[in-house]
């Protein structure tokens, strides 16, 4: 039933992915050997969304792990849940992509892609009714961005009617891991706009801020950051895996969140975020969850929703709560902050309620919003891109792998178009839309 195939690529993707499987295994009561050690039938009822049941009652994740160098995969394999994955599903090269998008997309990655697709095919054939794919990757490096987008376009060709959801880590505004990040990210966005159905936009700086300010961690590690991401990833699919009063799935999410096909880049948030020591001092209520969930400080990407307007949003609650209260709170948010929602999409917040909360919490909520302010992310990357591209800095690394400058120009203009589209809908009002139509009618 409604399986989701998980794919992780590159160092970032594999580290997020490894953390994600720790969270999912914990929710479904699966131990590090793949045996079920849980205490509730609900954990098993739809465990097959993310797991295959192998011989001897072992649960094996429907996961494909790929990288162009063996390093990160070795550490996944030796990590806490490393033995749970199917050994054949580790696909890796030896050369590395060296933070070069062209290597990941055209040369090194292209050599490895067929063996990855074989594994994907094998996993898809094991599914009863595949719902879609979720891909974890970063856009700043070489493998996750270059090879990740190559894989997405290949899967698109082969499974055109399945959902394609990505968790994409964008380059951060202040912290840069790589000088050529703006190039890699722009080339990737150029692909994601065309080939992905839903992109959850993440970035490390926003995650650091959450760890630092809200969770009060003095020195946040990547492990802490990835744990935040995993909580959100688990929240997005909890309705598929546990019974609930109001269900959502990847396709419902897309239908409710995407008013125009290109505008499918979402901000995500999670509540409750409390610092490790202070959990036991407060009970959570739906109003508190709602308040934290819509808080700008809670967003996992460096764009401020107060600088734009929400086209649509979706709130996924988990735990025992009254749906009436959820509906009231959602209505309340829209009424109080009506200036932050576009008025030409009435009732633009979708909510869903799943009965089973995450481990250790009474209730929780995941937020996914389609806000025009996400253009800040693209605008920032685009400015950095233009600054380097104008001088043709670092281009020889890409042209040397057979890329053409034209492709850079196309990617740049596609990204600028995307920013312009977001801006256009941010400024649009209900009345002027109507006037446009009248003028068109007269012109005809």
From Swiss-Prot:
InterPro entries: Beta-tubulin_BS, Beta_tubulin, Tub_FtsZ_C, Tubulin, Tubulin/FtsZ-like_C, Tubulin/FtsZ_2-layer-sand-dom, Tubulin/FtsZ_GTPase_sf, Tubulin_C
GO biological process terms held by the UniProt record: microtubule cytoskeleton organization; mitotic cell cycle
Keywords of the record: Cytoplasm, Cytoskeleton, GTP-binding, Magnesium, Metal-binding, Microtubule, Nucleotide-binding
Cellular component GO terms held in the UniProt record: cytoplasm; microtubule
Entry binding sites for GTP: 11, 69, 138, 142-144, 204, 226
Required co-factors: Mg(2+)
Top-level taxonomic group: Eukaryota
Induction of expression: By gibberellin. Down-regulated by abscisic acid (ABA).
UniProt GO molecular function: GTP binding; GTPase activity; metal ion binding; structural constituent of cytoskeleton
Localization: Cytoplasm, Cytoskeleton
Quaternary structure and interacting proteins, as annotated: Dimer of alpha and beta chains. A typical microtubule is a hollow water-filled tube with an outer diameter of 25 nm and an inner diameter of 15 nM. Alpha-beta heterodimers associate head-to-tail to form protofilaments running lengthwise along the microtubule wall with the beta-tubulin subunit facing the microtubule plus end conferring a structural polarity. Microtubules usually have 13 protofilaments but different protofilament numbers can be found in some organisms and specialized cells.
Described purpose of this protein according to its UniProt entry: Tubulin is the major constituent of microtubules, a cylinder consisting of laterally associated linear protofilaments composed of alpha- and beta-tubulin heterodimers. Microtubules grow by the addition of GTP-tubulin dimers to the microtubule end, where a stabilizing cap forms. Below the cap, tubulin dimers are in GDP-bound state, owing to GTPase activity of alpha-tubulin.
Family designation: Belongs to the tubulin family.
This protein's name: Tubulin beta-7 chain
Organism: Oryza sativa subsp. japonica
Recorded name of the encoding gene: TUBB7
């Amino acid at each position: 039933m409604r399986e989701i195939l998980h794919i992780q690529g590159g160092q970032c993707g594999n580290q997020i992915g490894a953390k994600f499987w720790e969270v999912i295994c914990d929710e479904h009561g699966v131990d590090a050997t793949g045996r079920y050690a849980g205490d509730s039938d609900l954990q098993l009822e739809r465990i097959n969304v993310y797991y295959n049941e192998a011989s001897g009652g072992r649960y094996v994740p429907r996961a494909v792990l790929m990288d162009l160098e063996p390093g990160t995969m070795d550490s996944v394999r030796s990590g806490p849940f490393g033995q749970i994955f199917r050994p054949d599903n580790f696909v890796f090269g030896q050369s590395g992509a060296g933070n070069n998008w062209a290597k990941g997309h055209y040369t090194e990655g292209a050599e490895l892609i067929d063996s990855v697709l074989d594994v994907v095919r094998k996993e898809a054939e094991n599914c009863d009714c595949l719902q879609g794919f979720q891909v974890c990757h970063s856009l700043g490096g070489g493998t996750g961005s270059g090879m990740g987008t190559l894989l997405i376009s290949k899967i698109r060709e082969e499974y055109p009617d399945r959902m394609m959801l990505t968790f994409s880590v964008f380059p951060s505004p202040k912290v840069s891991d790589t000088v050529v990040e703006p190039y890699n990210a722009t080339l990737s966005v150029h692909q994601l706009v065309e080939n992905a159905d839903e992109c959850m936009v993440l970035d490390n700086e926003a995650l650091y801020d959450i760890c630092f300010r809200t969770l009060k961690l003095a020195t946040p590690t990547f492990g802490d950051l990835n744990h935040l991401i995993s909580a959100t990833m688990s929240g997005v699919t909890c309705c598929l895996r546990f019974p609930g009063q109001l269900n959502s799935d990847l396709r419902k999410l897309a239908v409710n969140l995407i008013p125009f096909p290109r505008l499918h880049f979402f901000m995500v948030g999670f509540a409750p975020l409390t610092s490790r020591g202070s959990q036991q001092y407060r009970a959570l209520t739906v109003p508190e969850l709602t308040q934290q969930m819509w808080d700008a400080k809670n967003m996992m990407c460096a764009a401020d929703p107060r600088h734009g307007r929400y086209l649509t949003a979706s709130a996924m609650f988990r735990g025992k709560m009254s749906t009436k209260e959820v509906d009231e709170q959602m209505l309340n948010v829209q009424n109080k902050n009506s200036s932050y929602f576009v008025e030409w999409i009435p009732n633009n917040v979708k909510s869903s309620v799943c009965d089973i909360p995450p481990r250790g919490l009474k209730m929780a909520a995941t937020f996914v919003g389609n806000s025009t302010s996400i253009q800040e992310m693209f605008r920032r990357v685009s400015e950095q891109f233009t600054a380097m591209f104008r001088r043709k800095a670092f281009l020889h690394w890409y042209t040397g792998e057979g890329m053409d400058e034209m492709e850079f120009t196309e990617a740049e203009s596609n990204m600028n178009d995307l920013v312009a589209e977001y801006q256009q809908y941010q400024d649009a009002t209900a009345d002027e839309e109507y006037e446009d139509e009248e003028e068109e009618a007269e012109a005809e």
